[in-house]
Curated annotation (Swiss-Prot):
This is Elongation factor G. Catalyzes the GTP-dependent ribosomal translocation step during translation elongation. During this step, the ribosome changes from the pre-translocational (PRE) to the post-translocational (POST) state as the newly formed A-site-bound peptidyl-tRNA and P-site-bound deacylated tRNA move to the P and E sites, respectively. Catalyzes the coordinated movement of the two tRNA molecules, the mRNA and conformational changes in the ribosome. Residues 284-303 are annotated as: Disordered. The gene is fusA. GTP binds at residues 17-24, 81-85, 135-138. NCBIfam families: EF-G, PRK12740.1-3, PRK12740.1-5, small_GTP.
Amino acid sequence: MSRQVSLDRLRNIGIMAHIDAGKTTTTERILFYTGRTHKLGETHEGAATMDFMVQEQERGITIQSAATTCSWKDHRINIIDTPGHVDFTVEVERSLRVLDGAVAVFCAKGGVEPQSETVWRQADKYGVPRLAYVNKMDTIGADFFRVIRMMEERLGARPVPIQIPIGAEDTFRGVVDLVRNVAIMYYDDLGKDIREEPIPEDMRELVEQYRTRMIEAATEADDALMEKYLMGEELTVEEIKRGLRKLTVECKINPVCCGSSYKNKGVQPLLDAIVDYLPSPLDIPPVQGTDPETGEPAERKADDNEPFSALAFKVVSDPYVGKLCFFRVYSGQLKSGSYVLNATKGKRERIGRLVRMHANHREEVEVVETGDIAAAVGLKDTGTGDTLCTDAAPVILESMEFPEPVIQLAVEPKTKADQDKLSTALLKLAEEDPTFRMFTDPETGQTIIAGMGELHLEIIVDRLQREFKVGVNVGKPQVSYRETVRGRVENVEGRFVRQSGGRGQYGHVVINLEPAEPGSGFIFENKIVGGVIPKEFIGPVEQGIKEALQNGVLAGYPMIDVKVELVFGSYHEVDSSEAAFKIAGSMALKAAAQKAQPVLLEPYMRVEVTVPEEYMGDVIGDLNARRGRIEGMEARGNAQVIRAQVPLAEMFGYATDLRSRTQGRGVYSMQFDHYEEVPPNVAKPIIEKAQGKA
């Protein structure tokens, strides 16, 4: 079967940017000009084709990366629109993993904004070639050349403009195509009346300067071009494009275009640049993986005749077809109705139907080929990051890394009916989003949800109520405290005696209690000599002590890191029983803990904050105010990484706080490190609240 579109004419690209740089509008325009939509969708009207979740249309931001396919000049372009909010970086991570190239959209006024830095670093990590598009050239304060400077300074990029704007703000009329050396003028706001004209006189000098710079960059691609240029010969348009394309694919330069998507200016030249400079699946190195049977490295080339391999990068619950699994085909072909092996989980799966997505419309297809991005219906066990392949040639492709969730809160169903729906809904959401976790708190029995930030959890709760119709009450984020003792006490007794007619109860133990090494939990030592307590009653004593440790004497939190020695006791021939000794053990522990200087412990987190140098003092001061201890600092690129230990109780709301302190340019990660004593002034209100005094 011959391919519909040859591999060299396929482009898998992502569109990435800061919030409000206009990337969803840009995608909308691309779809309009490539004939996929017949009506322009405006983000601010809540009608954008790519933003199809209710939450996205209300907030005017993109949360889930929607995938869509379109055609331009005999090329097929698969586009993934990615969110620009820091709480959703996982969506960006996973789309970058399966793309071959990307378009970074910058706002002509805001330039390189904080999220642009984060997204750019993620693209660097995956080695994704990209071109830049400076949007909103018609807004007040638009400055194309300032954005170019910011790309160099903040991103360490090497931008090479292939267009420069004609006019700016309300006089923005078109662009100069530096490669073909012509002016493209727009005479209306619908992008219908477009004319090619000679370059305006007053811009000749500027155009010459930037064109020379672009041609010099192109000649670095190969010696033949360099030689021709140095001999003073003119390079042809084809040669310039070939040179720029080679360097872009190698991630050495970033061609830059400009326009105003909203006013329909500059979108067609951007499409031309996507086709001209971004890589096809043939331009990128073969994908690497491992053979699950031998553990040896394996690779798959982009070729329809190679064995089938694909990476699942997103799972969504669709109200009509159930579970939709998005995947990128790296090699071979796949027909609908066939069986595949999920090599990551070692399970065979049947592909029910194959669909190519256009935002939220689907088009059923019989077969998908190398380089395609499509979705499958019917994969029950496949999750994000799993590899799909043939039984005959299994391979596990490199998966994705997802950060651990850093914030958690309790959710409770409002009614009994909600109770049953809650866990099903949460499981579905956890399947879609690898950075969202849910678990039951063993101490309170509450359902806890954890995620990447407050906005992330807010949207999860919102989706529970809207999509899954589950009513929930949301608690405040909580901390799990612990208790321990600081002093040693000896010969504390626990005596449980009931002897008033009939079979009595008799248990009597004497214990010593002392602090144990941090992290050791609970140590029990039997020092009974001469059989004062028979062997069969020793186990129940230990059991009773363990149960008593679950509820500490200060505030009812579990006690950890204590050592108990059982030193003496007595028993009664008839009345002693396992139950009596269990109760005696727990009574002894409670009495001993009261006397052994009990203290409250809190979880300390290992926190890493990455911030631009100018905010460092402010951020360190703030961490100190949060009872944090700074452990060290190091430079990473043009940012500083601060490492600190901070109590979890002080970290609530930190994401929002850091964002405002650093104008959104700071990012942080944290994970649990150890438990440590709570200072008396902080512990007092916690203990009083637990004892019901507060």
